[in-house]
Amino acid sequence: MEDNNKTQAYDSSSIKILEGLEAVRKRPGMYIGSTGEEGLHHMIWEIIDNSIDEAMGGFASTVKLTLKDNFVTIVEDDGRGIPVDIHPKTNRSTVETVFTVLHAGGKFDNDSYKVSGGLHGVGASVVNALSSSFKVWVAREHQQYFLAFHNGGEVIGDLVNEGKCDKEHGTKVEFVPDFTVMEKSDYKQTVIASRLQQLAFLNKGIQIDFVDERRQNPQSFSWKYDGGLVQYIHHLNNEKEPLFEDIIFGEKTDTVKSVSRDESYTIKVEVAFQYNKTYNQSIFSFCNNINTTEGGTHVEGFRNALVKIINRFAVENKFLKETDEKITRDDICEGLTAIISIKHPNPQYEGQTKKKLGNTEVRPLVNSIVSEIFERFMLENPQEANAIIRKTLLAQEARRRSQEARELTRRKSPFDSGSLPGKLADCTTRDPSISELYIVEGDSAGGTAKTGRDRYFQAILPLRGKILNVEKSHFEQIFNNVEISALVMAVGCGIKPDFELEKLRYNKIIIMTDADVDGAHIRTLLLTFFFRFMYPLVEQGNIYIAQPPLYKVSYSNKDLYMQTDVQLEEWKQQHPNLKYNLQRYKGLGEMDAIQLWETTMDPKVRTLLKVTVEDASIADKAFSLLMGDEVPPRREFIEQNARNVKNIDI
C-alpha cells in the first residue's frame, strides 16, 4: 500500500477495545465458524491475517508460518511489533490486552490500519481463548519481549523484557489448539499452502514462507509475486488455452464519498482478466483479501463495464447494428478468467459470512477503472478486440439456441412431479429436508438399489454409462444430453443461469459408483458438472459420495465389510490365525439388495463423504487441469500425484 498508510505512532493508544472474551470457549462456533477442521484452519488464518494486515499497511515485507509436531503452530512477521507499553484502559500491557480482550486490536483504529481483512474481525484473542498454550514474542527497537498464556487465555506472569535481540521489529506467535474445545483433526497442508499462495498473489511483493516440519522430511514453500494479479491470472489459466496472450490489468487508488454515510474512503482497486477458449466463467472477487464468493458491488461494476465497452465496440466495428439484441452479462463472461480485488477501510457485507460485498460506492469506482483500462486495450489491440467480440457473439448465439431448446422442453414437459425422468424411482416423502437422491452407475446396480432402498426417503436415478464431460462442451450440448437432462429434472433446481436453490427436491444427492477406474471417472464427470452448473449445491454441502465396500470377509458365520485395502490389512494383522473367506467386489452389481442396504445405504451404518470446496479458484484450476483439453499439465499432475491418487483434494 502507499506511504500515506504509514500514519501516526503505533502505541497503546492505537489499540481500541470493544468487548470482553468470556463467551468464546462456550460458543466457539460463533467466532470461528466451527470446532472441526474448518475452525482449526480458521485459527491459523486469524493469526496470519494480523501479519498480512501489517504488510497491507506497508509495515511488513515477510510473513512465515511453521507447523511442528503436536499441533505447534508458529506465525511470525517483520512488522512493527505489537506495542509493549501499558494500555490506558486495561492498565495491563498492550500485548496482554491484544490477546485477552475480544476485538482489541489496531485494525479497529483507522489511524493504525487503513484496511483490514480478519475473517470476522475477532482477532488473535479468540485463538488464545481456544488454545491450550499460547506464546508471543515481540521485537521493538532490538528489544525482545515475551508473554505466555495457557488453558484458554490465562496469562502466566507479566510481559518480560528479555533484552537485546538481532531483530529490529516484528511479532512471533506460537499456539497449540485446545482439543478439549476443538475437535482433533489434522491440518491440511494443501489447504494451508493454497491459501498462503493466494495471499501472496493478492498482496504483490510480500514474501510468504511456509515450513511444514511434521514429517520426517520437512517441506518448505515460499511465494512472492511482484506481478500480483497478473501472475494470479496466469496461474489460473495455465491449463486453459488463452484467446490471446495479453492479460488485461489495471489498478487505481481513489477517494470516494460513501453513499450511505457522511464520510469519504480511500479505496484501492486492482483488476486483472484474460479470455480463454473454454465455455466456463471463472470470476473471483476479494475485499481486503477475503474471498467474496457471492460477488457484490465490485463484481457488478466490473461486469457492467465489460458489457458497455464490448457492446459499443461491436456496434462501432459493424459486428452489431444499433437495433440488434445487445450482448449480455452472461455472454461476456463465457471463457473469462478474472480477479477483482479491492482494499476498503470500511467494507459492508450482506450477511455475517462476508460472502457478498454491499458497499454501493464501490460499483461506480470499479466500473470507471475497468472501463478505462478495457477501452484502452480494445483501441490499442484491434485484433484481440475482434476476437473478444466474436467470442461473445458466439456465446450470445448459443444462449439463444439454449433458450429455445429450454422453452421447447418446457412446453413438452413442464417441470412438475408428473414430468420427472422415467428412469427415476422417486421416494414417497415430499419433504426435501429428509429425502435423498442416489445417482447410481448403470441400470443393473440401479435395479439393486431400487430394491434395497428405503423408498420412503430414498430415490434412485440410474445413469447409463459416462455422462458428458461438461468441461469440453458448450451449453447447448449439455442441455441436449439425455443423461444430464434426467439428472437436472430429478434434482429440480435447473442449472445456471436459471438455477433456483429453493426448488431442490433432495437434501442429499449421493453419487454411488463402482470402486474401480470407470467408477472414479464417472464420479469426476458428475462432480465437474455439479461444480460448473450447480455450484450452490457443492457450496452448501448437498453433494455426497457413497462408500460401498471393496471387500467382504466371511468367518465363523459372520460377514464383515471393508472399504479400503488399509482396513483389510489392519484386520489381518489383528487376526493372524483366523480362517476366513475373502470376496473382492468389482462393482455394485455383485452385491444383492440386502447387502447394498446394509453396507452402503442404511443411514445407521453407511459412510458418506461430503463434497466441499475450500477455495473455488483452486477447484476451478483442478477441474480445468483434470477434465480440460490440455494434455501435458494433466500428465504432469498425474505423475506427481500417482501415489496419492486416492486422496486428491480439490
Swiss-Prot record:
Keywords: ATP-binding, Cytoplasm, DNA-binding, Isomerase, Magnesium, Metal-binding, Nucleotide-binding, Topoisomerase. Residues 435-549 form the Toprim domain. GO terms for molecular function: ATP binding; DNA binding; DNA negative supercoiling activity; metal ion binding. The keyword DNA-binding applies. It is found in: Cytoplasm. Belongs to the type II topoisomerase GyrB family. Heterotetramer, composed of two GyrA and two GyrB chains. In the heterotetramer, GyrA contains the active site tyrosine that forms a transient covalent intermediate with DNA, while GyrB binds cofactors and catalyzes ATP hydrolysis. This is DNA gyrase subunit B.
